[in-house]
Amino acid sequence: ALPISVIHCDMDDVMLIILPLDHCFAHVAGFYTMMSYGGSIATVPVGKTAMATLKNIPIAIREVRPHVMLSVPALARNFRKSIEAGIKAKGPKVEKLYNFALNNAIAYNREYWNRGGWQNAWRYPLVKLFDRLIFKAVRENFGGRMKFFVGGGALLDIALQRYFCAIGMPMFQGYGLSEATPIICSNSFEGAIFGSSGRIVSPMELKICDAEGNIVPDGERGEIVIKGENVMAGYWKNPESTAATIVD
């Protein structure tokens, strides 16, 4: 399976990985993806403690000025808190203008795939104006070159997805697991819907089945079943778990 089928970068892009490097998500979505594009990779310096490493993240962002970052929802929430604390410190007038700009952009973006439209055409000039007046300065705190985040590891709530898209740094949610090396699907600029996990990587087959292995009708819950070269060969020296997981 090819992560580049859902994670699109340019040769001149720099990716900052702020996730543990001993996990296959950082390897595949980070190192191997950027190697495929001929791009550059940066990591956060490890501190003497976990807290020291976290404090190195904003320093690394300022130094690297990344185009893309691998992140998790917990860090994204902290980024938002930091941004809004900075806005609040500028006074009530700036905060009120910021909130108006944010709500206008969220309304314009709708569910991302259907953003804009004739009903929201009047919002577009305001989106561009406030992007230059407010959100451009916000993005400067992330180096001024950020295109998007790739988020994983936990559910990314829709409010956060709407927020980062509104300020011009979309955080695209993906889904996967280590047994699938590890990307199954992801949103991207080419195809995103807030609240979804995006398109599956190519080449890979996916279906949603019931307990008996039958494909469930659209709209019904079931188990995600995948098939492809990205699926693991099995668990190390654990044939019982392998037999229970690898069905076909």
Can you say where each PLM-predicted feature lies in the sequence?
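Conserved short hydrophobic patches within well-ordered secondary structure
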Residues: 1, 24-25, 178, 184
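Short, well-ordered beta-strand segments
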Residues: 14-16, 224-225
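Extended hydrophobic secondary-structure segments that form protein cores and membrane-embedded regions
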Residues: 15-18, 149
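Conserved AMP-binding/adenylate-forming
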Residues: 106, 123-248
